[in-house]
Amino acid sequence: KNYDQILSKDNFKPSEFSLDRDYFVLTLHRPINLTDENLKIIFDGISEFTSNYDILIPAHPRLRDYVNRNGIDTSKFKMINPQPYIKFLGLVHNSTLCLTDSGGLQEETTFLNKKCLTLREETERPITVEKGTNKVIGVNKNIISEINDSLNTKLTTYKEIELWDGKTSERIFEDFNDK
């Protein structure tokens, strides 16, 4: 049911976010990326793509506070408030590419079979890399080439990940009942 809501045209209206073309979703919230140095690398790199793509940033309060406090120019991007979960997944599902430092979004892009670049040096979700939807790229001067590589790479067809079948609560319930 939730997956159907994610895909529903009623849930996702590009005009609501002034999206006129294909777009990237960027989420940042980890303190390691909320520094002048790292934000400059990330924003400068992603800015290279604004002539062809909208950059949608559902801004975590920590990112918004940092940007406002430090007067960082985000005029090339569409910074929006955090969205309800299903609507956010609709944005992700309809995007061309996701860039994130969020572990949760790495999983969600894998489930939705969407390309994801992780702006960290490591991931707690290695299965997302193994399945080929996610690439850990860190934050460095190679961000432009990494985005280009991702845009020019076709994803393989999604194969269900063991235990990612929506039946976790049933397994937990059975486990409690067996004890």
Stretch-by-stretch model annotation:
Residues 43-59:
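A conserved nucleotide-sugar
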Residues 91-129:
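A donor-sugar binding/catalytic signature common to diverse glycosyltransferases
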Residues 49, 71-73, 90-91:
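Structural alpha-helical scaffold elements that stabilize or flank donor/cofactor-binding regions
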Residues 80-91:
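Conserved active-site histidine-acidic residue motif and adjacent donor-binding/catalytic loop
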Residues 65-82:
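Nucleotide-activated donor-binding/catalytic signature segment of Leloir-type glycosyltransferases, i.e.
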Residues 1-36, 137:
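A nucleotide-sugar donor-handling region in carbohydrate enzymes
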Residues 2-8, 135-179:
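Leloir-type glycosyltransferase catalytic cores
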Residues 117, 132-137:
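A short acidic/histidine/glycine-rich donor-binding loop in glycosyltransferase catalytic cores
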